[in-house]
Amino acid sequence: MDLLQEITKDNTLSNALSSFLSFYGPSGLSQAMQLYTDMNQEYVCRTKETLSIVRIYEIIYLEIHGHNIAVHTVHGIYQKYGSLSDELKVLSRYGFIKCNQSVLVAVHKIRSIQQDTVILTDDTYLHMSRSCAPKVIMAIAAKVSQQEL
């Protein structure tokens, strides 16, 4: 039996899905499924001595000093070795953008922007460079317009 037939046989699930679709539409369901998938993706922090695995959705921002990257998460700070440009290639699809020369930030963790400062949900204040400001502001505007849908 295929999955769609199983869903229609379960009245509770079928009703919940119908309600969701009538309120948010098919694109809302697609976005919800993508968000669920993204929230469960894992990110590896590796140094010579340690190996840590964190969920991408729990990362607040990454900060680089030389080739040492500090990965700030809701559970603490993890270390890894690498380059910020390589990390951006991996994390951009999950809503990470460059805030300045040495910081990548998760757009969903930005609470507000005040002049050249990005304020995060954990009350961290990060400098936003003039060269990165347009992309950060556009990403926040897109986030706000998605939330209004």
Which residues make up each language-model segment?
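N-terminal regulatory/sensing modules of transcriptional regulators
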Residues: 1-33, 149
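Conserved binding/recognition cores within well-folded domains
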Residues: 26-128
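Short, charged, intrinsically disordered terminal tails
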Residues: 140-149
